[in-house]
Amino acid sequence: MAKKKSKDKAGSNTIAMNKQARHEYFIDDEIEAGIELQGWEVKSLRSGKVNIAESYVYVRDGEIFISGMTITPLQAASTHVIANPTRIRKLLMSRKEIDNLIGRVNREGMTLVATTMYWVRSWAKIKVGVAKGKKLHDKRTDSKEKDWNRDKARIMKSSLR
């Protein structure tokens, strides 16, 4: 009998994470989207040269775009391609998903935030979070709760000894 191929691969499929988004926003829902990339950008993503922390997602003319995402070109990139690391990139979603996002942004006053970028087979995907901004007191209560959970875990660990 033939061996079955293992689907587990060494390493992670995650390319980049926006940890700041969880601190700045209440993320209500996350939707997966494809990204329209050029060849040199895919090569840079494979080497992990991307930053989505300062990026933002917006709607224009019924389409979804991401701006502020920096993909640093490789040193060995070809000379005839002019690389723009911060160009505006189109996100690829179904019309139903786009209409849903447009409705939530316009009616409910929600914001679109890029949370995670990862590989699905050979395709680069990005998770777009539908979020609402946190106030300063919300951030304070979150940090207090996080500290308390850390202290609680420390106390439980020491009491088991």
UniProtKB/Swiss-Prot annotation:
Quote the cellular component terms of the Gene Ontology held in the record: cytosol
Q: Which residues form the signal peptide?
A: none
Q: What are the alphabetically sorted keywords of the record?
A: Cytoplasm, RNA-binding
Q: Which Pfam families match?
A: SmpB
Name the domain of life: Bacteria
Q: Return the Basic and acidic residues bias intervals.
A: 139-154
Q: What's its job?
A: Required for rescue of stalled ribosomes mediated by trans-translation. Binds to transfer-messenger RNA (tmRNA), required for stable association of tmRNA with ribosomes. tmRNA and SmpB together mimic tRNA shape, replacing the anticodon stem-loop with SmpB. tmRNA is encoded by the ssrA gene; the 2 termini fold to resemble tRNA(Ala) and it encodes a 'tag peptide', a short internal open reading frame. During trans-translation Ala-aminoacylated tmRNA acts like a tRNA, entering the A-site of stalled ribosomes, displacing the stalled mRNA.
For this entry, the protein name equals SsrA-binding protein
